[in-house]
Amino acid sequence: MTDNNIENKEEEIINDIAEEVENTEIADLKAQIEELKDKLIRASAEIDNTRKRLEKARDEARDYAITTFAKELLNVSDNLSRALEHKPLDASVEVTNIIAGVQMTKDELDKVFHKHHIEEIKPEIGSTFDYNLHNAISQIEHPDHEPNSVINIMQVGYRIKDRLLRPATVQVTKKT
């Protein structure tokens, strides 16, 4: 072998090694790129999920922020309703004016409740007792109604959107 052949052989080996090293580096870099792309996709998805959770928490906080205040107003609404249920039929003009004022106050309170998605839970007589919405305080035998039916409403309940503020207090029928 001549020196020229040896040099060519060495150069060929060096080129092969350089090409192999370059291919290995390219493959490693491609793998790193794919790994980083995957991490970016996962991080982006996590950011989206976090944003959605925060939006949901913000919406719930806004929707239910008045829950405590609303619970305190329920008794006011009950008292206004009771006052209107017991108005005298032969009332004087002054009493009639007071009753009209109480009615206007109750109507205004009902508008505020409606505005803030607070609604009454007033089951129909004979409807099936629902432990999610009703609180049974007693059971009464009644031949005209199925067992576990609402027979009397002692106090209306309320909910704000889908959250219960106060269950309706009811009496239910029992088996005879």
From Swiss-Prot:
It is found in: Cytoplasm. GO terms for cellular component: cytoplasm. The keyword RNA-binding does not apply. One of its GO terms (biological process) is protein folding. SUPFAM superfamilies: Coiled-coil domain of nucleotide exchange factor GrpE, Head domain of nucleotide exchange factor GrpE. The keyword Chaperone applies. Keywords: Chaperone, Cytoplasm, Stress response. It comes from the Bacteria. Participates actively in the response to hyperosmotic and heat shock by preventing the aggregation of stress-denatured proteins, in association with DnaK and GrpE. It is the nucleotide exchange factor for DnaK and may function as a thermosensor. Unfolded proteins bind initially to DnaJ; upon interaction with the DnaJ-bound protein, DnaK hydrolyzes its bound ATP, resulting in the formation of a stable complex. GrpE releases ADP from DnaK; ATP binding to DnaK triggers the release of the substrate protein, thus completing the reaction cycle. Belongs to the GrpE family. Homodimer. This is Protein GrpE. It comes from Rickettsia bellii (strain OSU 85-389). The gene is grpE.
